[in-house]
Amino acid sequence: MTRLTLALDVMGGDFGPSVTVPAALQALNSNSQLTLLLVGDPDAITPLLAKADFEQRSRLQIIPAQSVIASDARPAQAIRSSRGSSMRVALELVKEGRAEACVSAGNTGALMGLAKLLLKPIEGIERPALVTVLPHQQKGKTVVLDLGANVDCDSTMLVQFAVMGAVLAEEVVGMTNPRVALLNIGEEEMKGLSSIRDAAAVLKTLPSLNYIGYLEANELLTGKTDVLVCDGFTGNVTLKTMEGVVRMFLSLLKSQGEGKKRSWWLLLLKRWLQKSLARRFSHLNPDQYNGACLLGLRGSVIKSHGAANQRAFSVAIEQAVQAVQRQIPQRIAARLESLYPAGFALPESDSDVNSRQQSGTNGHD
């Protein structure tokens, strides 16, 4: 394994350095080839490194930042006033080549905007998308995007997400001819928003894509598709709902029947069943797949949940390591170029044509 360097926005997220710095030390313990640049307030970071040994400290560097982008800041305003912030400094380290990837639990909109501004999208990609690989009940994986980078998506963006998701499934997850579906409120062709229906019409015409139609949210964990595409609003709500249900289920496994008097053999049986079921469903624990990759950029950026705990943030760091090792941006760009040698131009949907015509008619004099 070759050495690699990551930039961490340790000030981002709900808990800031109290979670991100211990997670950084945990990541260093599990990867001897990793170097971390901790971007943030040195006065807040330094005390949390008191337990770090000499070897860990040799692979750590504090990069001072003057401010933090608030989680509730409007993205446009946050970007305008971002100079000197921990998030921007971390991204600039990637842009300058001092780090190979960035990890942040900060404001999603600001991270999306700054990453697009500083690292630039892959040629032909309109907007990057947040993507993650979720486990499903068949013990396989499903690539899901967008998870919140773009609240409103037109049909062209959805088609681009589908192509990028399929490439990721092939090049990184190792799937052959991955099935691609659009998340919708029903499987019938006339169901859903016009953007979804128009995207479906275009996806059917792409011979390089194994498009299988619509999928409903209750089938997310069934393994019926390899790539699931949706707008960022729907994807974010769907993901967090799923995570909440899984956390509740795992919590019930641990606490069911507590406080009730039972015979010793029933208690032993209950504990055995709880441990067995917990192991069986542990792969669904949201902490184990924290970290969404901002797909479509020329550099690697990982967005962690804002509410991530130490374990979850360390998983996001590992996601960044894998993104660098697997050369995700480079492989996505190369695959798109091979699929579309004349340029990544997609057929226009009816709504996109109408929208362009209306903007031309209603333009400024």
UniProtKB/Swiss-Prot annotation:
Gene3D superfamilies: Isopropylmalate Dehydrogenase. One of its GO terms (molecular function) is phosphate:acyl-[acyl carrier protein] acyltransferase activity. InterPro entries: FA_synthesis, Phospholipid_synth_PlsX-like. The keyword Cytoplasm applies. Its EC number is 2.3.1.274. It is found in: Cytoplasm. Catalyzes the reversible formation of acyl-phosphate (acyl-PO(4)) from acyl-[acyl-carrier-protein] (acyl-ACP). This enzyme utilizes acyl-ACP as fatty acyl donor, but not acyl-CoA. Homodimer. Probably interacts with PlsY. Belongs to the PlsX family. This is Phosphate acyltransferase. The lineage of its organism: Bacteria, Pseudomonadati, Pseudomonadota, Gammaproteobacteria, Enterobacterales.
